[in-house]
Protein backbone atom coordinates (compact mmCIF):
# COMPACT_ATOMS: atom_id res chain seq x y z
CA UNK A 1 0.00 0.00 0.00
CA UNK A 2 1.28 3.45 -0.92
CA UNK A 3 0.54 6.56 1.16
CA UNK A 4 0.60 10.31 0.66
CA UNK A 5 1.06 12.19 3.93
CA UNK A 6 -0.43 15.68 4.16
CA UNK A 7 1.54 17.63 6.76
CA UNK A 8 5.25 17.28 7.45
CA UNK A 9 5.67 18.22 11.10
CA UNK A 10 5.78 16.36 14.40
CA UNK A 11 2.56 14.38 13.94
CA UNK A 12 3.78 13.09 10.57
CA UNK A 13 6.74 11.40 12.30
CA UNK A 14 4.39 9.12 14.23
CA UNK A 15 2.30 8.50 11.11
CA UNK A 16 5.51 7.55 9.27
CA UNK A 17 6.35 5.00 11.96
CA UNK A 18 2.83 3.50 11.80
CA UNK A 19 3.02 3.07 8.04
CA UNK A 20 6.58 1.82 7.81
CA UNK A 21 6.05 -0.75 10.57
CA UNK A 22 3.87 -2.72 8.15
CA UNK A 23 5.35 -4.92 5.50
CA UNK A 24 4.57 -3.72 1.99
CA UNK A 25 3.44 -0.25 3.12
CA UNK A 26 5.38 2.79 1.99
CA UNK A 27 5.18 6.57 1.87
CA UNK A 28 5.52 8.07 -1.59
CA UNK A 29 4.94 11.74 -0.73
CA UNK A 30 4.95 14.36 2.03
CA UNK A 31 2.91 17.41 1.10
CA UNK A 32 2.99 20.57 3.19
CA UNK A 33 2.59 24.22 2.25
CA UNK A 34 5.93 25.02 3.84
CA UNK A 35 7.32 23.70 0.54
CA UNK A 36 6.99 25.89 -2.54
CA UNK A 37 7.87 23.40 -5.28
CA UNK A 38 7.35 19.71 -5.88
CA UNK A 39 10.61 17.76 -5.76
CA UNK A 40 11.78 14.23 -5.03
CA UNK A 41 14.23 13.18 -2.37
CA UNK A 42 15.25 9.52 -2.40
CA UNK A 43 12.18 8.64 -4.54
CA UNK A 44 9.74 10.41 -2.18
CA UNK A 45 7.84 13.47 -3.37
CA UNK A 46 8.16 16.58 -1.19
CA UNK A 47 6.00 19.57 -2.09
CA UNK A 48 3.02 21.83 -1.46
CA UNK A 49 -0.44 20.42 -0.73
CA UNK A 50 -1.85 21.43 -4.12
CA UNK A 51 0.55 18.90 -5.71
CA UNK A 52 -1.81 16.13 -4.62
CA UNK A 53 -3.63 16.08 -7.99
CA UNK A 54 -0.43 15.44 -9.92
CA UNK A 55 0.55 12.63 -7.56
CA UNK A 56 -2.93 11.04 -7.66
CA UNK A 57 -2.85 11.10 -11.46
CA UNK A 58 0.42 9.15 -11.41
CA UNK A 59 -0.50 6.90 -8.45
CA UNK A 60 -4.30 6.46 -8.37
CA UNK A 61 -4.10 3.55 -5.92
CA UNK A 62 -2.66 5.53 -2.97
CA UNK A 63 -4.21 6.29 0.41
CA UNK A 64 -4.03 9.79 1.88
CA UNK A 65 -3.43 10.51 5.57
CA UNK A 66 -3.90 14.00 7.01
CA UNK A 67 -1.02 14.20 9.52
CA UNK A 68 -2.11 17.46 11.15
CA UNK A 69 -2.72 17.53 14.91
CA UNK A 70 -4.79 20.73 14.91
CA UNK A 71 -8.44 19.79 14.45
CA UNK A 72 -9.57 22.91 12.57
CA UNK A 73 -6.61 22.77 10.20
CA UNK A 74 -7.20 19.06 9.57
CA UNK A 75 -10.85 19.73 8.68
CA UNK A 76 -9.92 22.67 6.44
CA UNK A 77 -7.44 20.53 4.50
CA UNK A 78 -9.94 17.70 4.04
CA UNK A 79 -12.49 20.19 2.72
CA UNK A 80 -9.92 21.91 0.49
CA UNK A 81 -8.74 18.62 -1.02
CA UNK A 82 -12.31 17.41 -1.57
CA UNK A 83 -11.09 13.89 -2.37
CA UNK A 84 -13.42 10.95 -2.91
CA UNK A 85 -13.75 8.83 0.26
CA UNK A 86 -11.89 5.87 -1.27
CA UNK A 87 -8.61 7.78 -0.92
CA UNK A 88 -8.94 7.60 2.87
CA UNK A 89 -8.98 4.63 5.21
CA UNK A 90 -8.42 4.24 8.94
CA UNK A 91 -4.78 3.90 9.95
CA UNK A 92 -4.59 1.72 13.05
CA UNK A 93 -1.45 0.78 14.96
CA UNK A 94 -0.84 -2.92 15.33
CA UNK A 95 -0.15 -2.10 19.00
CA UNK A 96 -3.65 -0.70 19.60
CA UNK A 97 -6.42 -2.82 21.12
CA UNK A 98 -9.64 -2.55 19.11
CA UNK A 99 -12.91 -4.28 19.98
CA UNK A 100 -14.42 -6.22 17.07
CA UNK A 101 -17.68 -4.32 17.68
CA UNK A 102 -16.06 -0.87 17.45
CA UNK A 103 -16.64 1.22 14.33
CA UNK A 104 -13.83 3.41 12.98
CA UNK A 105 -14.47 5.69 10.01
CA UNK A 106 -12.20 6.85 7.18
CA UNK A 107 -9.15 9.03 7.75
CA UNK A 108 -9.00 8.24 11.46
CA UNK A 109 -5.65 7.41 13.05
CA UNK A 110 -5.37 5.14 16.10
CA UNK A 111 -1.93 5.35 17.71
CA UNK A 112 0.09 2.70 19.59
CA UNK A 113 -1.26 1.70 22.99
CA UNK A 114 -4.74 3.10 22.35
CA UNK A 115 -7.71 1.04 23.49
CA UNK A 116 -11.07 1.19 21.71
CA UNK A 117 -13.67 -0.86 23.57
CA UNK A 118 -17.02 -2.47 22.73
CA UNK A 119 -19.57 -0.63 20.61
CA UNK A 120 -17.46 2.55 20.41
CA UNK A 121 -18.03 4.61 17.27
CA UNK A 122 -15.33 6.93 15.92
CA UNK A 123 -15.97 9.42 13.12
CA UNK A 124 -13.91 10.64 10.18
CA UNK A 125 -10.39 12.09 10.48
CA UNK A 126 -10.19 11.61 14.24
CA UNK A 127 -6.93 11.15 16.16
CA UNK A 128 -6.93 8.69 19.06
CA UNK A 129 -3.44 9.34 20.29
CA UNK A 130 -0.85 7.24 22.10
CA UNK A 131 -2.27 5.32 25.06
CA UNK A 132 -5.71 6.95 24.89
CA UNK A 133 -8.76 4.98 26.06
CA UNK A 134 -12.15 5.12 24.36
CA UNK A 135 -14.37 2.87 26.45
CA UNK A 136 -17.63 1.09 25.66
CA UNK A 137 -20.42 2.91 23.82
CA UNK A 138 -18.46 6.14 23.32
CA UNK A 139 -19.25 8.21 20.24
CA UNK A 140 -16.61 10.49 18.76
CA UNK A 141 -17.52 13.04 16.08
CA UNK A 142 -15.46 13.92 13.02
CA UNK A 143 -12.16 15.81 13.44
CA UNK A 144 -11.90 15.21 17.19
CA UNK A 145 -8.62 14.45 18.96
CA UNK A 146 -8.14 12.40 22.12
CA UNK A 147 -4.60 13.32 23.19
CA UNK A 148 -2.08 10.89 24.71
CA UNK A 149 -3.45 9.12 27.79
CA UNK A 150 -6.83 10.83 27.44
CA UNK A 151 -9.60 8.64 28.86
CA UNK A 152 -13.23 8.54 27.78
CA UNK A 153 -15.07 6.29 30.21
CA UNK A 154 -18.26 4.54 29.10
CA UNK A 155 -20.98 6.19 27.01
CA UNK A 156 -19.20 9.51 26.46
CA UNK A 157 -20.06 11.61 23.40
CA UNK A 158 -17.59 13.97 21.75
CA UNK A 159 -19.12 16.21 19.10
CA UNK A 160 -17.24 17.41 16.01
CA UNK A 161 -13.79 18.92 16.56
CA UNK A 162 -13.51 18.28 20.30
CA UNK A 163 -10.01 18.24 21.80
CA UNK A 164 -9.41 16.11 24.89
CA UNK A 165 -6.09 17.22 26.38
CA UNK A 166 -3.26 14.96 27.48
CA UNK A 167 -4.22 12.82 30.47
CA UNK A 168 -7.75 14.25 30.75
CA UNK A 169 -10.62 12.02 31.88
CA UNK A 170 -14.32 12.30 31.06
CA UNK A 171 -16.62 10.39 33.45
CA UNK A 172 -19.41 8.14 32.10
CA UNK A 173 -22.42 9.39 30.21
CA UNK A 174 -21.26 12.94 29.52
CA UNK A 175 -21.26 14.93 26.28
CA UNK A 176 -18.61 17.41 25.13
CA UNK A 177 -20.02 19.96 22.68
CA UNK A 178 -18.85 20.86 19.19
CA UNK A 179 -15.31 22.32 18.97
CA UNK A 180 -14.91 22.45 22.76
CA UNK A 181 -11.57 21.78 24.47
CA UNK A 182 -10.77 19.91 27.67
CA UNK A 183 -7.43 20.91 29.18
CA UNK A 184 -4.59 18.52 29.95
CA UNK A 185 -5.04 16.59 33.19
CA UNK A 186 -8.65 17.71 33.73
CA UNK A 187 -11.39 15.47 35.08
CA UNK A 188 -14.71 16.32 33.46
CA UNK A 189 -17.67 15.66 35.79
CA UNK A 190 -20.45 17.45 33.88
CA UNK A 191 -21.28 17.87 30.21
CA UNK A 192 -19.74 20.80 28.33
CA UNK A 193 -21.66 22.89 25.76
CA UNK A 194 -20.49 23.79 22.26
CA UNK A 195 -17.48 26.06 21.66
CA UNK A 196 -16.11 26.08 25.21
For every predicted segment, state its role:
Residues 36-97:
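Phosphate-bearing ligand-interacting subdomains
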Residues 2, 26-28, 63, 87:
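Residues at the starts of beta-strands that form the adenosine-phosphate
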Residues 10, 72-73, 187:
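Short alpha-helical
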Residues 2-17:
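Glycine-rich adenosine-cofactor-binding loop
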Residues 22-40:
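NAD(P)-binding Rossmann-fold cofactor-contacting core
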Amino acid sequence: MKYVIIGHGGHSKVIKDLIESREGHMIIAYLDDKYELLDTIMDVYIGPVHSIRLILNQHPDVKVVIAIGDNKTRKAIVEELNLPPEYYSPLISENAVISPSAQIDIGTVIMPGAIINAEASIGKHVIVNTGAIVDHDCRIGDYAHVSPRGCLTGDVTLQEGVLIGTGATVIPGLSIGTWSKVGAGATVVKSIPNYC
